[in-house]
Amino acid sequence: MAEKRKTSRFWILGNKGLDTNLIVITMFLIIFGLIMVYSASYYKCSITKAFGYDSMYLLKNQALMSVVGLIAMLAVSNINYHFWKKEWVVKFAVALSILLTLVLLTRVFGEGHPLNFSTTANGATRWVKFGRISFQVAEPVKIAVIVATSWLIDKYGAMEIKWKKFTLRHWMVTAIILAPGVGLAGFLGIISSNMSSALIIAIIGVVMYFAWHPKSAIFYLAALAGAALIGVFIYVVSQQGAVDAEEGFRLTRIRAWLDPYSYESDESFQSLQALYAIGSGGLFGKGLGNSIQKLGKIPEPYNDFIFSIVCEELGVMGASLLLLMFIYLLYRIYSIAQKAEDLFGRMLATGVFSHIALQVVMNIAVVTGAMPNTGVTLPLISYGGTATIFLLVELGMVLNVQKWSERKRDEDIRMERFR
């Protein structure tokens, strides 16, 4: 008798047989995020004219986008994931990513010009804006990289596995498979100066290839070489003298990370305030809504530094609960990837897994001072409506991988019974 699987019986938008656990943990994270966005933002919203002096301004925006994202997730979960395997879909996704990245170049027209569809902040042009709709270009690019890399691995992977040694053909296929991640990441980094998102996009492609490839020794060597280069770079930067204006804000951020108290009034101010927030929270925190650091110390506590407010208000216990929810979310995605009926579905789920895991690790590393400030948000928790929508679309893809894989297993079981 077939093993009874834990699947939902929801019929919303025809979604029968979806992974209940993944849906529930996603809902918990969204609700947790809404609570923390309100707690972190209500003070600033209530005293800011741009927010209409409405303490619930950002909460209402985030709640609306979360609802839109959940509808999009359920809709995408009804689309057979093999649709994303069609060549024209892959090419369209990559072409659209390139086009949206090129739109960022309209910044040359200057702020306020009708032909400028980009927004620049802190030295990086990350956003495109069409009317009242704005979003980070990196978000759709991440989806395009996941889809394109999955398609290439599915198309060329079987061919590469047959080769016993790293021949020229092997390297050529490897370059082709890594091209979407590395290529689009480099293109985005050059055009937008958004190096943190570019790094995430490139690593997503590499992780997907590493997760699939049976010959892992070369990747361990590459990782060691990369770590060594980063170490040398940090050492060289730490030995230099004062930072010149020409060196740019990125190098300044690295210097501020290495020696935060020399930059405590400018570049390191937010990072140090975040550490004070984390340290003052203790085991159980000051209580929801009782943060002191959000009262002007941390400029935008509802964005990429929201984890520090979680620690201050809910303490180690609250932060641990949040991390456990993320771990369980990643576990569900990993489980779906392992049980996918084919390589393409497995790679789709792996790509989403790597995206979420990378952002969680990088965000918490920045907030705790383990990395320089990158501007990477905490998935489903930080304020950011369009980022939430795109991430929920990715989770919709994962839900469909589980749905169709389970359907295929059920069909195989029925066929076995009739034999």
Labelled PLM ranges:
Residues 27-44:
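Alpha-helical transmembrane segments of multi-pass membrane proteins
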Residues 316-360:
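Hydrophobic transmembrane alpha-helices and their immediate junctions
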Residues 112-113, 119-127, 220-318, 343-344:
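Hydrophobic, glycine- and aromatic-enriched re-entrant/interface helices and adjoining loop segments
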Residues 34-37, 73, 146, 150, ...:
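Alpha-helical transmembrane segments of polytopic integral membrane proteins
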Residues 199-218, 292-314, 318, 377-389:
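Interfacial segments of multi-pass membrane proteins
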Residues 89-95, 175-188, 195-242:
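Hydrophobic alpha-helical segments of polytopic membrane proteins
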Residues 2-21, 45-192, 364, 368-377, ...:
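Membrane-helix boundary/helix-loop-helix interface segments in multi-pass membrane proteins
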Residues 19-26, 88-93, 343-351:
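Membrane-interfacial loop-to-transmembrane alpha-helix junctions, especially the N-terminal start
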